[in-house]
Amino acid sequence: MPILKQLVSSSVNSKRRSRADLTAEMISAPLGDFRHTMHVGRAGDAFGDTSFLTSKAREADDESLDEQASASKLSLLSRKFRGSKRSQSVTRGDREQRDMLGSLRDSALFVKNAMSLPQLNEKEAAEKDSSKLPKSLSSSPVKKADARDGGPKSPHRNGATGPHSPDPLLDEQAFGDLMDLPIMPKVSYGLKHAESILSFHIDLGPSMLGDVLSIMDKDQWGSEEEEEAGGYRDKEGPSSIVQAPPVLEVVPPLGRQESKASWDQASMLPPHAVEDDGWAVVAPSPSSARSVGSHTTRDSSSLSSYTSGVLEERSPAFRGPDRVAAAPPRQPDKEFCFMDEEEEDEIRV
């Protein structure tokens, strides 16, 4: 498209050039659009192929022209032209503006009757065949509601009423009421037909959420079983594990005869006293054995065999967990004393 001449000069104080400078050479060749085939200026000047405008103007009656000229309501194009006229330069006089207003009315009458432009005249649009209207206007739900109620049909905005569609199914598919939708066969995939135009259903197939939740539940069950098993072990643990009671060390004397005498005195103690007081006779510690010497090995072996027999008979660990739980702890007998003053040098706690 060729570049138009500059309408405004570079100087700020210079006035806008007159529109008389516009010529037909400024209009480009037709490019497939009706806007490039002709031009109608604001002052009534027209360029290009305007034969259809003149033919329409000749066919119009004098009465229709008088009614349109004397109408109080101006057309849509005349309003636009008047609004654009206000944005023009203020330096023009009132006389020039009056001439412009008169030419605007004339040009509006010409353009109003153009076939390529929208219908602006209600009388001419009413005379047109209603079959040329789009199908959405002829099958509007407003018309259907009026026809169903038996009331008068309300005319459309352009004053035309469309013909009734013979096929109701096609009419519904094009544009119709929400309550009268055709019944569609059910799809084998389980999709439901939307009850409203604004709603729809989407089926994304089987979901993996069920598998994920089942795996999570299995993990939770395994952790709970482990916790229960651990708690059962903790409950049985203290009963099955026997804590080591305070050790009663028997320090053998330097002489073998004295050690035998002290061992006889220790063996004469009643077994229930050993059990009640929580004492256990064990073998002498390695430090004491090293300090005494090698002559005490025979006494220590006999002492360990005796203590093992006592533990097997009297220890609560060999009774079983049920008997241990049933037997209450017994307080030590304060009146009974198995340590004499003579044995304090030989037996010590």
Swiss-Prot record:
Subcellular location field: Endomembrane system; Cytoplasm, Cytoskeleton
Positions of the UniProt region annotated as Disordered: 123-172, 220-240, 278-349
Basic and acidic residues compositional bias, start-end: 123-132, 311-322
Expression by tissue: Ubiquitous.
UniProt main location, coarse: membrane
Biased composition (Acidic residues): 338-349
Subunit structure: Interacts with CDC42 and RHOQ, in a GTP-dependent manner.
Function, in words: Probably involved in the organization of the actin cytoskeleton. May act downstream of CDC42 to induce actin filament assembly leading to cell shape changes. Induces pseudopodia formation, when overexpressed in fibroblasts.
Record-given protein name: Cdc42 effector protein 4
Name of the gene: Cdc42ep4
